[in-house]
Amino acid sequence: MKLLLLNILLLCCLADKLNEFSADIDYYDLGIMSRGKNAGSWYHSYEHQYDVFYYLAMQPWRHFVWTTCTTTDGNKECYKYTINEDHNVKVEDINKTDIKQDFCQKEYAYPIEKYEVDWDNVPVDEQRIESVDINGKTCFKYAAKRPLAYVYLNTKMTYATKTEAYDVCRMDFIGGRSITFRSFNTENKAFIDQYNTNTTSKCLLKVYDNNVNTHLAIIFGITDSTVIKSLQENLSLLSQLKTVKGVTLYYLKDDTYFTVNITLDQLKYDTLVKYTAGTGQVDPLINIAKNDLATKVADKSKDKNANDKIKRGTMIVLMDTALGSEFNAETEFDRKNISVHTVVLNRNKDPKITRSALRLVSLGPHYHEFTGNDEVNATITALFKGIRANLTERCDRDKCSGFCDAMNRCTCPMCCENDCFYTSCDVETGSCIPWPKAKPKAKKECPATCVGSYECKDLEGCVVTKYNDTCQPKVKCMVPYCDNDKNLTEVCKQKANCEADQKPSSDGYCWSYTCDQTTGFCKKDKRGKEMCTGKTNNCQEYVCDSEQRCSVRDKVCVKTSPYIEMSCYVAKCNLNTGMCENRLSCDTYSSCGGDSTGSVCKCDSTTGNKCQCNKVKNGNYCNSKNHEICDYTGTTPQCKVSNCTEDLVRDGCLIKRCNETSKTTYWENVDCSNTKIEFAKDDKSETMCKQYYSTTCLNGKCVVQAVGDVSNVGCGYCSMGTDNIITYHDDCNSRKSQCGNFNGKCIKGNDNSYSCVFEKDKTSSKSDNDICAECSSLTCPADTTYRTYTYDSKTGTCKATVQPTPACSVCESGKFVEKCKDQKLERKVTLEDGKEYKYNIPKDCVNEQCIPRTYIDCLGNDDNFKSIYNFYLPCQAYVTATYHYSSLFNLTSYKLHLPQSEEFMKEADKEAYCTYEITTRECKTCSLIETREKVQEVDLCAEETKNGGVPFKCKNNNCIIDPNFDCQPIECKIQEIVITEKDGIKTTTCKNTTKTTCDTNNKRIEDARKAFIEGKEGIEQVECASTVCQNDNSCPIITDVEKCNQNTEVDYGCKAMTGECDGTTYLCKFVQLTDDPSLDSEHFRTKSGVELNNACLKYKCVESKGSDGKITHKWEIDTERSNANPKPRNPCETATCNQTTGETIYTKKTCTVSEEFPTITPNQGRCFYCQCSYLDGSSVLTMYGETDKEYYDLDACGNCRVWNQTDRTQQLNNHTECILAGEINNVGAIAAATTVAVVVVAVVVALIVVSIGLFKTYQLVSSAMKNAITITNENAEYVGADNEATNAATFNG
């Protein structure tokens, strides 16, 4: 019976950020799966009858299983191959009859599960096969064997009509759980064939061949003395990482950090023991290492050897305290090609330490936490494997929209999940596309509610796009709701969106929370009455109820994959670790010394699928059913009945004890008070050295160690030999002081004690500052303004008094120089009088960066703005002065004393300037006096009254004729009152005048434009404002910015409109065009053929003037700044420009013998390979050099002969007879030749003399002669190929 074999790899590891896809496998993604996600792909072979289901997202662990069936003479055989590309074997070495053979690296192998369709229970009538709609696609239900209940395929078939052309839609497990495949892969037989040819046939058993170069940064932040030695010893394992090009150590000492560069060979205990980490948070070290690694990775120096270029930075952080700041792993490390691996000593499993350390990592299995000395070896081994695997070459993460498969090809995930519509996978482009392609089928609809309108967004679901009135939340912690969502006219209500604690807060209490209407964040409201207490073991936890009461409950453990459907397994909490584990239900034994490490428990066909445990011979076991624990603290381990549930162990210098009353364990220190200290049998050793040594515990043993500075005791020093005997040595007279190089002198004190002092030479004229500056490690040690020293003759060292150094200072010629002091940006501005006024913007040192002052009063009465202040002094109330600053300024970084971005620093100076604008307030403004020398306050209504002869009043900042005036204007034409008297009776009438209410504003516009244009040539004048009569009375100035939008047909030369109207001159604003065509309109860019997306091309604006005086412009390529046609560095490479980055890409020219020399036979070509000549770039033949196994020469006809190097009578290639005329014999000449050139010349001479028409042979040797001469000219010492593998592979005959 033909079986459908579904081979699934159940992996649990971290995924590359590139491969993080939303989980789509309902059954296998019960948790976060170690922060990674499941993703994989199905493929089928139509001809060879195998199925492949392999996980790609777990790259670089490239691992999958093939099951293939073949039928020979009616006998069917199926073989299973487990393949891991990081560690393949030769295909011819595979024993196909051994189906249990697994030739992967064991450390990267994963459990395999086999699923089968139960064809006996599948209807033979296709019409009876049930169809099911799964994710918008019609699938068919098939019975399956345990642990499956059913499998759903997208093809209808029976056992008689089954086909290989199907996709899996879903798997239903016994118990109700299922795996749903939410997208479907395109069938692609070519992909499988290529994979089979290029991957399974790869025969190199080399772990590191696919690893990239890296630089290793190790940050020492673990100070616990009980584990330091083990760490230093085990870190030597990292020296096996062959692609590490350098190592840098980072560590704290007091308030200073230090770095040390070592080679990979020096990464061992003897080197690391010299450097001890000081206490403190390692945050600054991480930032320094990050910057150092980013610089190395970004270094693309053209003169650097390609074999030495760093592709990925690797940072190892050793820490035992929580970080002081948070890091964003993706932006700060991943995108800079830096992988961070953390090794955390967390004895008490403090969640704060775990949480802060996890913020550093995101790629691969990079987090390693341990609690004691006995876990160091396993932790560093896991670290080594994680680093090695992570150094595997990957696809370009910026170009690949999917992720990498085992051949570094870009493909897409199995789970192309989209919450809003159905998807399918396009394996050619590596992207997930909507399904069906023409009209994607919606997965979720989002109807409107009384809150507002909704739309579906991937990973978010239905989200509000537009709130109805009263529904917009006022602050973040409020959420709108309605009593009846379907009533679209109901008024929204607001409620707090704050959840109470489910677990106690860090202070140990349960809290409820309420919404803070001021900040928008949830704040603590009510605290529980009592602190959480009462836990007695690691398998208990605190929980909070709705009344903020705390209680203790046992941890509930749930079985995880692949154990869920395995009835023999149960989920148990490990009392030692507090972690849930999947264990066999009958396994109640734990080892306690003896010759075995555990009991043998099984649950399979051999035990009738029942759980059964057998003790191993010579094993010592404790049975938890009998309340037994193992006591390892004595001479030999032994089981004992105890109220405690944890084994009693030693961890370094700590011993775990049990309090039988409270049923809890506690730690106590190892007692070393009885350890004896031995001194040499002389008259000084014990007297001088006794106070400097004491007993202590180190790595679980009582040892004697120094407790003070034993290098300076009396007039000598103390040391402990390999026999642990302490001896005093008197060496004062041979010592030199650390500073000043003064001789030591032994003196006796008043208390009869001796000391070695280093008094200054009496003949020396140097001061303490001079002496100490030479041996100081401080920056700028000789600058006595900030550093003063005192020489201490007792120690021969110096004490320094350090004053705070100036901000933004550097050391030049031995002195601190302030780089930002008195720096100012010089600026000019043209004011209303048409004159240029100079002003200065000071620069300040902020966070060690010299930036323009962040706030400036542009009308300040100071030295920077004095002239502008005086100009506007008469009417400053009507002047709006604006300080323009870069939009890239980060206020948060500024307040947190962090540096600004590089982008900000590039534009900061250019973007800092002041602008001035005169405004009108209550019909008063600032205006030039008639002499145009200064400004004064002007009452516009008074001016109107004066000019018009009628009374004006201010209304809404517009001057209108007094509404009580009898003669109101008509269409803004002013009327005056005419009084006539006749017979003593006065009559009042209105008379038209030539004046209008627009006259004043028209004059303002005219004067402003005249002042702006005066004395300037080539000023573009496009008017964008005019006066408009409103309501017969008012005549304001109305601007029309539409006139300032660049008309595609109007050419203003190398100037372009900005779309803004100047509020003073009422003329359109222009920007000057120099070298940035993006500022110009698309019309003129297209006309000049500008390619904005081509970084290889730089442009310049060229202006011309026609005979009619019309100015036009065009964009020309700036040849000096462009990189359109880069030149190759030598004839054997081509040079092209990357249009995205503008950088030059150099590609080596390649050639093959069969293409360049088509008449050469494979046998002749066996001795030669093709390469490019650096003289002229032509293809030339090069003869192979000798190797350890092969020796090459030519016979008289030029035929290639390959000989066994150890037995030169044995020819390794096919022998070809050479037939030449009898009188020609140049074998002796060839044998005597010492270079390839001489050999070839001898052969050619023979052939020319004979002239027997052997054209192919002649072409071979004549070409070879040309090459030999070329090679000789280039390099007198001829170098052949490196190995016979290359020799055999490069000729393509």
Swiss-Prot record:
One of its GO terms (molecular function) is carbohydrate binding. It is a single-pass type I membrane protein. Keywords: Cell adhesion, Cell membrane, Disulfide bond, Glycoprotein, Lectin, Membrane, Signal, Transmembrane, Transmembrane helix. Residues 16-1234 are extracellular. The keyword Cell membrane applies. The keyword Glycoprotein applies. N-glycosylated. The chain crosses the membrane at residues 1235-1255. Glycans are attached at residues 95, 198, 234, 261, 337, 377, 390, 468, 487, 643, 659, 890, 992, 1138, 1204, 1214. GO terms for biological process: cell adhesion. Residues 1-15 form the signal peptide. GO terms for cellular component: plasma membrane. Residues 1256-1293 are cytoplasmic. It is found in: Cell membrane. Lectin which binds galactose and N-acetyl-D-galactosamine of host glycoproteins and thus mediates adhesion to host cells. Mediates adherence to host colonic mucins, an essential step for pathogenic tissue invasion. Heterodimer composed of a 170 kDa heavy subunit (hgl) and a 31/35 kDa light subunit (lgl); disulfide-linked. This is Galactose/N-acetyl-D-galactosamine lectin heavy subunit 1. It comes from Entamoeba histolytica (strain ATCC 30459 / HM-1:IMSS / ABRM).
